[in-house]
């Protein structure tokens, strides 16, 4: 079995291309995923930024939501940025009508907590598990995590708010590392996928 993991990016809406580039730099085979049969062929999945309600509704429409929930429950590594973080939350504090989540991280998330698009900003974030300088994070109408359960590990905070969380094979950030050219968070995720593949092959 090749050591190179195949990592998908849910390609229904959002900044898909930037994630595909970041994953390729992180030595993964990166593929867009829109349908259940494409989901079945990947070792891990990125849920990109975008509009969480739209992504949720399209995931249901394309028949991806239920198989995605099942694979996350079964331990498939998954990484959500911004809207993707909201998708991985077990609970949203301020959900919009018809909004569903995949779940996977025992956390409560507040949508658009850092403000609207005109209040977007960049900030250096110390992320546990990422060596070297702080990660340059782009926050665009970003959520933050109000609280986490006992199983969830806080990896980073900004301005007193939780902005990066991991629970088992699920990773989530409020910010967009894929927009800065700093691919260390994607390397961290690719390493999670590799470790999971190795464990499954034993």
From Swiss-Prot:
Pfam families: SNO. GO terms for cellular component: cytosol; glutaminase complex. Its EC number is 4.3.3.6, 3.5.1.2. L-glutamine binds at residues 50-52, 111, 140-141. The active site is at residues 82, 176, 178. Belongs to the glutaminase PdxT/SNO family. It catalyses: aldehydo-D-ribose 5-phosphate + D-glyceraldehyde 3-phosphate + L-glutamine = pyridoxal 5'-phosphate + L-glutamate + phosphate + 3 H2O + H(+); L-glutamine + H2O = L-glutamate + NH4(+). The keyword Hydrolase applies. The keyword Hydrolase applies. It comes from Streptomyces coelicolor (strain ATCC BAA-471 / A3(2) / M145). In the presence of PdxS, forms a dodecamer of heterodimers. Only shows activity in the heterodimer. SUPFAM superfamilies: Class I glutamine amidotransferase-like. InterPro entries: Class_I_gatase-like (IPR029062), PdxT/SNO (IPR002161), PdxT/SNO_CS (IPR021196). This is Pyridoxal 5'-phosphate synthase subunit PdxT. GO terms for biological process: glutamine catabolic process; pyridoxal phosphate biosynthetic process; pyridoxine metabolic process. The gene is pdxT.
